[in-house]
Amino acid sequence: SSRLNAEWVGFTLSWYGKLFHNEKMLMAAWNSLLIGVTASAVATVFGTMAGYAMYRFRVRLLPVLVLAPIAIPEILMGVSLLIFFVLLNISLGLISIILSHIAFCIGFVAIVVRSRLAGMDESLTEAARDLGATPWKAFRLVTLPLIMPGVVAGALMAFTLSIDDFVIT
């Protein structure tokens, strides 16, 4: 209960009460959740598409483009995105932070989804196509439910990374 770390006076929860009455801390927590949820949702959609494209089409440059944010150090990516936003006259704020987090998280989602697709039995999708399903219907009714654990895992990973990653911000 002491204001000094070096002096132990006793156990108290009073500081947590003060934390929840601090407007700046509540606003920071709200912004963090907003950024995390938005970035992970958008990164999950685009990361799933990227993972599917990397699995389905063997384009040499695609994995390099999608997975580059994973290999680049966070500080370098943060500075690069800052320069990018300034050059394009994009105002620095919540939108630019969300875009940065999306760019950072897409690669992680793509890796998880691609690995889930690699473990999937392709004959199930082929059977759906043989039975008259369109490519979209086969994807929606067969492939997507089978890769859903990977999509959810990618979304959770993206949310965790977004909440954790202060350097990109």
Spans of model-derived segments:
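Short membrane-interfacial helix/loop motifs at transmembrane-helix boundaries
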Residues: 1-23
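Glycine-rich helix-loop "coupling/hinge" segments at transmembrane-helix boundaries
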Residues: 3-9, 160, 166-169
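Membrane-interfacial helix termini and adjacent extracytoplasmic/periplasmic loops
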Residues: 6, 13, 75-105, 136, ...
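Hydrophobic alpha-helical transmembrane segments of multipass integral membrane proteins
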Residues: 26, 30, 34-46, 50, ...
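Loop-to-helix entry region at the N-terminal start of transmembrane alpha-helices
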Residues: 27-35, 84-108, 148-150, 155
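Short hydrophobic faces within alpha-helices
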Residues: 29, 54, 68, 123-131
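Transmembrane-helix boundary motif in ABC transporter permease subunits
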Residues: 35-66, 83, 122
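Transmembrane alpha-helices
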Residues: 102, 110-114, 121, 135-164
